[in-house]
Amino acid sequence: MDRRSLLMSPALLAAPAYAQGARARTLRFMPQAGLSALDPIFNPTTIVTTHGFCVFDTLYGADRALRPHPQMAAGHEVSADALTWRITLREGLRFHDGDPVRARDCVASIRRWAVRDGFGQVLMQATAELSAADDRTIVFRLRRPFPALLDALAKPGSSPCFMMPERLASQPADRPITEAVGSGPWKFLPGEFVPGASAAYLRNERYIPRDEPAEAAAGGKRVHFDRLELTWIPDGGTAAAALRTGEIDWIEYPLPDLVPVLDRDRNTKTQIYDPNGFLGFLRFNCLYPPFNDVRLRRAIRDVIVQPDFMQAVALPQDWQECHAMFPCGLPNVVESTPATRGVAAMDRARAALREAGYRGEPIVHINPSDFPAVTQQGRLTVDLMRRLGVNMEVVESDWATIIARRANRAPPAQGGWNLHNTNGPAATIANPAVSWAIRMHGAAAWPGWPEDAGVEEQVAAWVQAPDVAAQEAAMKKLQELLWEAVPIAPTGLFRLRTAFRADLTGVLQAPNPMLWNLRRS
């Protein structure tokens, strides 16, 4: 039985729904992957960040246009010379264990986050002193003006600056915490956690939402359900059938070929997940041959036919070509002119393989088997590389296992890797300060570990630009350098659709699913 037939099965359509009382009190959500870790600072993948937004809160939150707004903060004051920022916490904030949220908890949380996050590292380089003046006041004393301070604290994806109790935040950043206690709108239930399969949460009755309307990660995080369940269903067809029968309320990413079926069903709805979209790309491991040779990375970039990759993950109206190192459509992003495709490009790539010293050694491509927006792109990469004459060794596994292997710096034959397909929500790679995909600072870089001093100098020029004109000039020059340095090879920009029960209202558009503002009509 194929997926469409499965969805139309009379047995499934006739399956009894949960009792109305239980359904009214419980929100059942199927994320893009199974939750296997609890620390969104140590493991900033989308699924762990989704969990993080449930359990933890942030000092500032970003709206759909990525503008920062106070969240845990009541507000802030900036000195006349722009070198001292004083952030005041809202009154009455408490952690799930009952302890009050204090400024020293936030200071410890910011420090731990900044060790692992690129934007955080840039912020701390500009910070001479970070301290708690009293229980409700956080003080940044800067070495130089840093107008993007609130943008750093409000970044909505790929390691948001979540606030934790000091006892957790004081733990080393290179080791994950195993206790999920925050001050967010949901309380994690450790006794019901099955790594990779399911997680459960209770509404935080002590949570004090802001008065403003909810928008993305900003505004009032009002929870109207008593209980939240995250359930991972590996098969997309089974998940869609469960949505149609009411066994689950929301699927983060339905399979693209099932979206038309869900749109036709009066009991289900779909909408664009995040209007800013996702940039797909191929990541190279620059530590080892042959992709430590930039000439080969350029050649592989130029044989990627983006429509092939995009058609595999999104509906025709939901993707576009994007020959850029930042998501197309965002401010100051400039596309490069793609090289001539076809036979000539393939011949150039084969020549580049020879020049890089490739002699038929196995090239390890790691690919998740349970993440449709990545899985199909990875398989297309494998096919492309084989057509170039590369001896491909394919490692497909669940997303959590691939994430663990991706972090392994060992040689490919000893548990490491050469190639990896993935994507980034536009908000998490929107500019040089937040983008983990373009940084080229060697061992400190995102897995792939590329190194290019010129790129890093230009990132610094953007961050330290004294005015808008200088920042725009720095951005233009940086994109030129990145296109030649090739830390990633873009495969296109696409917008995914999310699917939910028609009686579920208040689904927000954001880089992550925001599990508040939801009601059952």
Feature locations, PLM:
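Ligand/substrate-recognition segments at binding pockets and active sites
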Residues: A197, D235, P254, W319, ...
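Long beta-strand-rich cores associated with HINT superfamily self-processing modules
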Residues: F500-S521
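N-terminal lobe/hinge region of extracytoplasmic solute-binding protein
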Residues: M30-A80, R111, V181
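Surface-exposed binding/hinge segments that line
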Residues: T88, V122-A169, A173-V194
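Extracytoplasmic/peripheral linker and loop segments enriched in polar/acidic and small residues
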Residues: G342, L388, E393-A407, P432-A502, ...
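Structural transition elements
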Residues: W186, Q317-E355, S369-Q376
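Periplasmic-binding protein-like
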Residues: L287, F291-L330, Q376-Q377, L482-G492
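Ligand-site clamp/hinge motif
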Residues: P209-V261, N391
